[in-house]
Structure formats: structure tokens, C-alpha cells
Amino acid sequence: YGAIYASSINLSLFEISLYMMIITSAGALSQWPIGYLSDRIDRRVILIGVSFMASGLSLFFVFANFMPLTLFLIFTGLFSVACLPMYSLTVAHTNDFLQPNEIVSASATFGILIGIGSIIGPLFVSTFMEILGAVGFYIYLFLIHGLLGLFGLYRMTQRTKPRDLESQYNPLPRNISPAGMEMNPVT
């Protein structure tokens, strides 16, 4: 829906390409510094931080029509830095609580959840965009990331992080298959 949003705010074909390139490259490059931090700081803190960062940055896009293109693309990159590493952070955090023989099953569950989200998400986003216009895309993302951050704060009060089971962060694409996880020598 990023390209649909960009087209809806009247970006040219080249500008839409820049927008999509920045989303992908900034998100990919942010995996390493965010992963490095999450190996040294409680992953929940990092997850909550990037959730609220993504939520807050989403609000800037409500005013995208009034921004110069350069500023719009900078905010796009910052949003992507906060948003794209969330899947890998969540997998690493989950693995902190699992035994090695449980990792493949958990990864399969993540695959199913991503699939469900990929089906349901566009229905909600399109509804927001239909009702609110192009800004509905980022208003939806503002709400989703804000709720994730609040859920993370709530969960921090429910259990502590087990230091002895902590796993290393690995940047993972969202579409990794359970078969790929079976190649993990730990399992």
C-alpha cells in the first residue's frame, strides 16, 4: 500500500520509486544497528522504542502534502528504520523464551501469523484510506504501532527477560519458510 499511498499524494513515478527504494533500503540497513542494540539492551525496550518511534513518525505523513520532497523522504527513511526491524526483533525476543527444539514450531507460527496479517491488514488499510483519504494509510500505521508499544509496556509488567536463554538477533525477512528454519543447527 506504500506505492498506492505515494500515488494518492500525487508523487511522480520517479518519486514513488525513490519512496519505495528508501523504505526498503533504510529498513534493511537498520537491521544491524538495531540488532546490535537488542543484543545488549532488553529487547522489549527496543521493541517498545521502535513501536512508539514508528507511531510518532506516522503522524508526520499526515502533512506530507505540505512537506518538501527531501523532508518527506527523510521521514520515510526514519519510519522504515523503526518499522522494518520489528519482525526480527520479535523473533529474537520469542526465541529468548524457547528451548532449541521449540524454535522451528514458533517460526512456523510466525509464518502463519504473518500470512493472516497480510490478508487482514490490507482490508483495514484500504478502509482507512477509503474513509480518510491517502493519510488513512499512516493513521492506520500510527494506531497499530502505538497499540504495539502499549502492549509491550503492559507485557513488561508481566514477566522478566530470562538472561540465560537469550539468543542472538538475526536479521530475517518476513517471508522465511519453516523449512528454512529447519536448517538452523541449533534445532
Descriptions of predicted regions:
Residues S30-D42, M129-E130:
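Helix-to-loop junctions at the C-terminal end of transmembrane segments
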Residues R155-T187:
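Intrinsic disorder in cytosolic terminal tails and internal cytosolic loops
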Residues T24-W32, S118-I119:
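Residue-level signature of mid-helix packing/kink "hotspots" within the transmembrane helices
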Residues L84-Q99:
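Intracellular juxtamembrane helix-capping segments at the cytosolic ends
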Residues T127-H145:
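A membrane-interface helix-boundary motif in multi-pass transporters
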Residues Y1-E15:
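Short amphipathic helix-loop junctions that connect adjacent transmembrane helices
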Residues V45-F60, F142:
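Structural signature of the two symmetry-related core transmembrane helices
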Residues L13-F14, L98-F110:
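Loop-to-transmembrane helix entry/capping segments in MFS-fold secondary transporters
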